[in-house]
């Protein structure tokens, strides 16, 4: 029996390589699954700062979805590294916008719990 393929319109992130950096296992899996359903090639989840940096340096990435607090360490270095490579980032966080450094204030921010449709739309807006 042949598997049915979803059309590109049903998979709006088709072909995009999205890095997910999230230290909460359940949130990470939920995000990754939703992004795959939308057609993204998911890199990660990276669960800490070092794994996120390694992925940025090793992988071809179109967009990064970053939790701000990774096991007590702030992920702003990841956003800066992505920006240096001209790759858009999106913060998925419980932190208020006032916690984000001024030089990263223009990075899109979604509040947790992240609405997965809003996440998909933010990635579309940043990358397409």
Regions found by a protein language model. Give the residues of each.
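Active-site residues of response regulator receiver
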Residues: 67
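Acidic catalytic/metal-coordinating carboxylates
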Residues: 48, 74-77
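A Lys-centered signature of the CheY-like receiver
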Residues: 112
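Conserved acidic carboxylate
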Residues: 22
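Non-catalytic signal-transmission and effector/linker regions of two-component phosphorelay proteins
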Residues: 1-17, 115-128
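Acidic, metal-coordinating helix/loop segments flanking the phosphotransfer/catalytic sites
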Residues: 45-63
